[in-house]
Amino acid sequence: MKSIDIRGARTHNLKNINLILPRDKLIVITGLSGSGKSSLAFDTLYAEGQRRYVESLSAYARQFLSLMEKPDVDHIEGLSPAISIEQKSTSHNPRSTVGTITEIHDYLRLLFARVGEPRCPKHDLPLVAQTISQMVDRVMQEPEGKRLMLLAPVVRNRKGEHVKLLENLTASGYIRARINGEICDLSDPPVLELQKKHTIEVVVDRFKVRSDMMSRLAESFETALELSGSTAIIADMDDPGAPEMVFSASFACSECGYSLPELEPRLFSFNNPAGACPTCDGLGVEQYFDPAKVVQNPDVSLASGAIKGWDRRSLYYFSLLTAVASYYAFDIDTPFAQLPAKIQQIILYGSSDEIEFFYINDRDDKIQRKHTFEGVLNNMARRYKETESNAVRDELAKYINNRACLACQGSRLRQEARNVFIEQANLPEIAEKSIGEALTFFEQLELNGQRAQIAEKILKEIRERLQFLVNVGLNYLSLSRSAETLSGGEAQRIRLASQIGAGLVGVMYVLDEPSIGLHQRDNERLLNTLIHLRDLGNTVIVVEHDEDAIRAADHIVDIGPGAGVHGGQVIAQGSATEIMQIEASITGQYLAGKQKIEIPTERIPYDANKLLILSGASGNNLKHVELVIPVGLFTCITGVSGSGKSTLINDTLFPLAQNALNRAERTDVAPYQAIDGLAHFDKVIDIDQSPIGRTPRSNPATYTGLFTPIRELFAGTQEARARGYNVGRFSFNVRGGRCEACQGDGVIKVEMHFLPDVYVPCDHCKGKRYNRETLEVRYKGKTIHQVLEMTVEEAREFFDAIPAIARKLQTLIDVGLSYIRLGQSSTTLSGGEAQRVKLATELSKRDTGKTLYILDEPTTGLHFADIKQLLAVLHKLRDQGNTIVVIEHNLDVIKTADWIVDLGPEGGAGGGQIIAQGTPEDVAQQPGSHTARFLTQILAKG
């Protein structure tokens, strides 16, 4: 078949659509947020493609796979096995890294095991294993007639008299030994000092080099290796100062005997006990009690509470500190910061001195004991380890922090693995390089002879996989980067690169906005990757709003016309040119330039006396930058992926502002020197795209605070008062008014083992969540269930006469959420929808005009028309006097900003600098900025 034929798709809000999609093409599905794009791409096409493949497996195999729900569709023909690449975080496993996800680490392990050069950590000498034949051949290269002796080292730099050893050697028939560099007769050995280190090497054979002695020499080497374990030495009998030949039968250092077993791939795996650092078990980090968290207020004294739980109110612990203060003669009322460094060290880490302590027991008797002081940090660590109380453990956990493991320096690998090199680089050093740098390293790597042959195929796989990651714009990441720290867009592009590496043909790939988090500069490379995937012989279906992606598509499907109940129809399909000619297509109108987001006619000037200045920010790749944000304006933080935007705003500015304005106690602030200007704000709010709730019970009505006044209305009706129902009666979270059969969920979960779990409507309440008595109470003819089933638009009209409710509903309409239902489960909301629910909640609150709002890529999942609506909301917040800081790549947002801070010039180590700060027009003139190049083009369009 040359096409995918869909008939009667009704999944979620799809209106019984019929659609024919070409196979082996790049197809972009676009439309307003909530119009039904994901319902078509993921919940219909992908779900059915995956379901059909999984159903072909045995019932036994199916129980290990999560089978998707059968979509509500009459008929689909022409489907291939489907692979979905979504924007989910790749893994919450701390052992998962970019290298392990992409399997590059597996190839690196194989490479190091086969062609790596082990070295001694102490002497930096290569560890080389030799056969007896190689040893004999080497000796036979010496001049004919040269007098040599073969030694077997049996003791190396070890204390002791070694009397028994020397006696055993004599009994075994050995005549001579070299002891501490001197040849001695074993019949009369020297007396060795017990407390000194000695080296004893047995003379196994003495010979002149002759061509007919190879078999004798081989036997002598066998004896020497057996005697020493694995090492043999050839020394010149006539010239004691001549260089000696050291041979090893195992991977061992010729100087100290440091040895390795045969190199295997598992030695280089931090997920295998053979390779993992024994201190941190391969995690690369270790937990420790952080002095900065323990001493929360160094400007006050120990007596006044510099260390929480050890002040005057805690009789036992304070008595310990009092005794320590008495012994070391310092004042317990002196501020902790003013105590000598040595005293601070003793308080935190303890002392080996015997100190007299006085205790009061249960009978108020004073008891005296003399012992060492373990220190506050050691005390906490011991209690954390020994306690069986979860409450104590949770309290102590507040003082714990993570740091790079001191034993492996965060590399996760044991010492043996860290001391294997390829061209002077070990595995952790390669994993720490950015992907771009790693690719350059392997492209320039030249191995010789047999090593080159062995490594050829492995290197080809490594280079290809690294190139795929560069092609999807991830050259700034390192292979050692933990999967937990990746954004949704980064995780998706890593999976995309892995799929290209797999080289599958005849597959249907479904992607969700792969351009998220990607700068315009990297967009072209991403699109080339998608085209490459198509050219392999695959159907690539992309849910996307990016203009470049839409124009590059072979086939576009525009879903609309509106969102939610107003969407679910195919408005237009075809090429970009065809879409632009269809008046009903909002996407087509924007592509044709008939509709657009206008550039402000004039920029709002900033007040030089009202600035937020963050100095010396140096977290991750930031290079001591100074960030200037004008108060009361709309600021955009721009820059290529990995340039340091999130580190600067999310990891530095936001936690600092939280601590100062919201009374948070965050200690995970990235390094900085100073911050000035927070006095201009009364609170900071981060509006991100995380879910507004993780259970079916949470919904827009409960999150925005709408549900409380609605329940109060129902409780105030004549019927409710007559029955004695209060507000709690109309809650589905507590006993009373809810249906107890489903506990207010409205559905019952049925586990089906090798089929997906089925949620069936509750038999008792028929999915209405409330019991019959509660549903008998009506407000204006509607039950509480019917109100929750209303869309925001319907509810706005219904509650028009109730200002407290109408105002909150209007803010939801203002942010473009008129189509969602009040009781819609939060788990069904997209990231963009969840973010706009949060925005609406903030808009509905009484505004002081002194709020600092931080948003990270708010345009995720938003169509051109949605972005226009979002910008109207952000500009409204700005016009009320608030300060808006947005991390964004979308040029329509950037061009409407009052102020831009552009980071770069590149990602990773090549970034971390502020390239430009100023109005969009100022930044567009900056020659070293990638953002400027694209900004110039869009400003010229007007």
Swiss-Prot record:
Q: Where would I find the C4-type zinc fingers in this protein?
A: 253-280, 739-765
Main localisation? cytoplasm
Query: What does the UniProt record say this protein does?
Result: The UvrABC repair system catalyzes the recognition and processing of DNA lesions. UvrA is an ATPase and a DNA-binding protein. A damage recognition complex composed of 2 UvrA and 2 UvrB subunits scans DNA for abnormalities. When the presence of a lesion has been verified by UvrB, the UvrA molecules dissociate.
| Annotated ranges, domain ABC transporter | 310-586, 606-936
What GO molecular-function term can you cite, just one?
ATP hydrolysis activity
Which InterPro entries does the protein's record reference? ABC_transporter-like_ATP-bd, ABC_transporter-like_CS, ATP_grasp_subdomain_1, P-loop_NTPase, UvrA, UvrA_DNA-bd, UvrA_inter
Q: Where is the signal peptide?
A: none
Q: HAMAP family given for it?
A: UvrA (MF_00205)
Q: What is the species listed in this Swiss-Prot or TrEMBL entry?
A: Haemophilus ducreyi (strain 35000HP / ATCC 700724)
Q: Which GO terms describe its cellular component?
A: cytoplasm; excinuclease repair complex
Q: Which residues bind ATP?
A: 31-38, 639-646
How does this polypeptide assemble, per the annotation? Forms a heterotetramer with UvrB during the search for lesions.
Annotated GO biological process: nucleotide-excision repair; SOS response
- The entry's protein name is UvrABC system protein A
Family of the protein in this entry: Belongs to the ABC transporter superfamily. UvrA family.
* Subcellular localization, as worded in the UniProt entry: Cytoplasm
Taxon lineage: Bacteria, Pseudomonadati, Pseudomonadota, Gammaproteobacteria, Pasteurellales
Q: Which keywords accompany this UniProt record?
A: ATP-binding, Cytoplasm, DNA damage, DNA excision, DNA repair, DNA-binding, Excision nuclease, Metal-binding, Nucleotide-binding, Repeat, SOS response, Zinc, Zinc-finger
Taxonomic superkingdom: Bacteria
